[in-house]
Curated annotation (Swiss-Prot):
Keywords: Cytoplasm, Ribonucleoprotein, Ribosomal protein
Protein name in UniProt: Small ribosomal subunit protein uS2
Entry keyword Ribosomal protein: yes
Stated family: Belongs to the universal ribosomal protein uS2 family.
Amino acid sequence: MAPQMSQKEADIAMMLAAGCHLGTKNVDFQMERYVWKRRADGIHIINLGKTWDKLMLAARVIVAVENPQDVIAQAARPYGQRAVLKFAQYTGAKALAGRHTPGTYTNQKDAVFAEPRVLVVTDPRTDAQPISETAFVNIPTIAFCDTDSPLKNVDIAIPANNKAKQSIGCLYYLLARMVLQMRGTISPANPWDVMVDLFFYRDPEELEAKEQEEEETAAAAAAPAADAGYNAVADAAYGAESWDDQAGAGFGAQAGNWSEAPAPTGWDAQQGGDFGQGFGAMPPQGY
């Protein structure tokens, strides 16, 4: 019997399956310490052991904030928007998905002004504006950093693949679970009843195509059941025989009269006949 994996080993196996270890061909000089090796094709492999340690550190920082609403998770990248919304749903934090409004953390007259205690971003490149703003107001920043990500103004860098939708969803899932475990909301001994698939990005076009395919399959399955008592062959034969009998009889009756002169009908039959008979029967008068 194989020994049971520890929580860290199970999490690393999940991150491997999600592709969190795959970096890029470029490496920032500050990210070299998190790179394990370089593949033959030039892709750098991230050390997931250090990724797990940084996830634990980030979870401790988030748990230290008394009010969960003072934590903001932000993602401008489309693949990370669903993940930050799910992270905020389960941890009680706020989520900002989509384009960042300049001045959100620095302009107090802005309608969307916010003063978080901790900021969590998905990519230091696409989320460069909120990182630069939080640096002005001394807000700690946690960021998922790839091998080519700049670490300027980033306080806690979590080395991982921040470009794939499975990787981003897995990272936010693990971070949310660690936060809930440290708060005592869920027990570390029991598995979390939330699936990691809920944090993955879903393409609206793929969902629409899938729903349409399911509807077509259901309609095709219901069609034979509705027509089970209908015999198309017998109905076609009956219709053909009835049409032949009726059309043939009428056609034959009309065909036999083709050699005869057509009988007058309408005004000619009534007026013409009476006029001929009356003219022949009247005797000449006045001659």
